Amino acid sequence: MEQADSLSLPSATWETRYLEDVKLRRLVLELYDREHVALRRYLSFLGVEADTGREILQESFLKLHQHLLDGGDQSNLRAWLYRVAHNLARNWQSSARAAKTDFLADATATGDLPSRAASAEDQLLTVERAERFRAALRQLSAAQRECLTLRAQGMKYREIAEVLNLSVSTVGENVTRGLEKLKELI
């Protein structure tokens, strides 16, 4: 009898771990479905090329899964994910000493340009507006650009603070000053 009980315990433990892993995978997949497009856009904004961005995205979600398997905090997984992707992008940029990619090329890759059905004049106006906006963005500090980009992704100040490792008040200042400067420049 004792031997039978000891044999069933590892099986129960294995089943429990398996079921927990299945739940965590579902959670990661749900978060992927909700956030991967916006997160990829954010990486593109940071100057990460498309291929590298896909790798960083994949590594970020793998790290998220491992974080959850290790029993990590689940209170704000979206901010956690952005912080990891942000840090991976910064590490890539510093190790590769990569220059920022052309935003117009990224817009083409992500489909953010006007459709072919639009008139040539509309397309030209859209491209000119986008160029003016990008030129204005380049005049902001890196912190202001990052805060505004994450805010445009729908993040709250608290989440942005977590991602960028800043205080909430600093995030608020960066957003406010960034918007004011954009209004002046555009």
Provide a role label for each language-model segment.
Residues 147-148:
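A short pre-motif secondary-structure segment
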Residues 13-19, 27, 131-140:
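Short amphipathic alpha-helical boundary/capping segments
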